[in-house]
Amino acid sequence: MDQLRGASVFPKIDLRSSYHQIRMKEGDISKTGFRTRYGHYEYVVMLFGVTNAPAVFMDYMNRIFRPFLDKFVVMFIDDILIYSRTREEHGEHLRVVLEILKVKQLYTKLSKDEVKFLGHVISAEGIAVDPAKVESVLQWERLRTVTDIRSFVGLTGYYKRFIERFSEIVAPLTQLTRKEQPFIWTDACDRSFDELKRRLTTSPVLVLPDSGEPFDVYCEASHQGLRCVLMQNRKVVTYASRQLKNHERNYPTHDLQLAAVVFALKV
């Protein structure tokens, strides 16, 4: 999402029946055969569910859009996100993308200026968490196994840039995933679980940074971890945090503060 800084127009193009737009090699068609009571059938286009289909399709899309990736195009399988600073610039970007699709005979459908992409909602105001993902987190019942914890932490961790002090809040849960750690659900785990849900439902809209404007970086260190927030024009661009490594727990205060500065500058 960092490529989108400074942009304000975000159309998304979805390819129709994406895999079916790639023809099978002649020698592989017979491998897809199946029989029904109506007869024998074989796929002449790439079918959904094949192990290598996503990789093959992604490789093809990356090759045809390679000159424009991270300039004004972001690709994820059959989703093409175009980002532009102005509507005039957007017109040229859209023309280039549509021309490539026309030449390659790929058929599409267009989305609106506010689009959902990789679990985020992107608009001129910034980036927000997809409400559908928030709903799935809210419906999560109490975690009863290490696998449950890893799944929950993995999903909420995907949105950690929206959550201030994420690493500190999640610490009681990650503690239970460590090797040889007995699974004992405590009040601290309950508070962590509930707080992560609350933070996701109240997460801010993160602004898309403008490289031409100054940034403000705020950082903090404690024995609970390192934390920082990147802001621009008094609006949050991203939160970041991490737990301390074992050797860092022995740092004196001034070294911890310096570690927080280094961590913030690497975000």
Where are these regions (language model features)?
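Metal-dependent nuclease catalytic cores in nucleic-acid-processing enzymes
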Residues: 1-4, 8, 62-66, 97, ...
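Amphipathic alpha-helical blocks
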Residues: 1-37, 105, 112, 148-172, ...
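C-terminal reverse transcriptase regions that engage the nucleic-acid substrate
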Residues: 5, 52, 60, 70-71, ...
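Conserved polymerase palm-domain catalytic core
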Residues: 10-64, 117, 176-180
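Catalytic palm subdomain of template-directed nucleic-acid polymerases
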Residues: 20-23, 61, 66-105, 116-126, ...
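A short, polar/acidic, helix/strand-boundary loop motif
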Residues: 39-56, 181, 232-259, 263
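Short, conserved phosphate/pyrophosphate- and ester-handling motifs at nucleotide-, phospho-/glycolipid
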Residues: 49, 130, 220
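Acidic, metal-ligating active-site segments
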Residues: 224-232
